[in-house]
Amino acid sequence: MIPGELVIDDGEHTLNAGRHTIALVVANTGDRPVQVGSHYHFHEVNDALSFDRAAARGFRLNIAAGTAVRFEPGQTRTIELVELGGARAVYGFQGKVMGPL
């Protein structure tokens, strides 16, 4: 075993069980693709993405860690977000929060 290595059982695994989730419709209004990583505070993603930003405050994509969702120009899709855990404080990104939620 390598330090930090995780050995996962085969089969399906439920991510973020018991955590509050929401669904939002997101449209890429820009002329370039936008990719959003699994742990990016969705409220602060690229301004070319059009959606209810107030509803997304304190949420991230409900996808496996280390993965991402790509929004092609002109594409509209429904995504699922999961509430941020831990201390529920956000620092960095676009600097729109910089503290507790």
Swiss-Prot record:
<comment type="similarity">
    <text>Belongs to the urease beta subunit family.</text>
</comment>
<keyword id="KW-0378">Hydrolase</keyword>
<dbReference type="InterPro" id="IPR002019">
    <property type="entry name" value="Urease_beta-like"/>
</dbReference>
<dbReference type="GO" id="GO:0043419">
    <property type="term" value="P:urea catabolic process"/>
</dbReference>
<dbReference type="GO" id="GO:0035550">
    <property type="term" value="C:urease complex"/>
</dbReference>
<protein>
    <recommendedName>
        <fullName>Urease subunit beta</fullName>
        <ecNumber>3.5.1.5</ecNumber>
    </recommendedName>
</protein>
<dbReference type="Pfam" id="PF00699">
    <property type="entry name" value="Urease_beta"/>
</dbReference>
<comment type="subunit">
    <text>Heterotrimer of UreA (gamma), UreB (beta) and UreC (alpha) subunits. Three heterotrimers associate to form the active enzyme.</text>
</comment>
<keyword id="KW-0963">Cytoplasm</keyword>
<comment type="pathway">
    <text>Nitrogen metabolism; urea degradation; CO(2) and NH(3) from urea (urease route): step 1/1.</text>
</comment>
<dbReference type="InterPro" id="IPR036461">
    <property type="entry name" value="Urease_betasu_sf"/>
</dbReference>
<dbReference type="GO" id="GO:0009039">
    <property type="term" value="F:urease activity"/>
</dbReference>
<dbReference type="InterPro" id="IPR050069">
    <property type="entry name" value="Urease_subunit"/>
</dbReference>
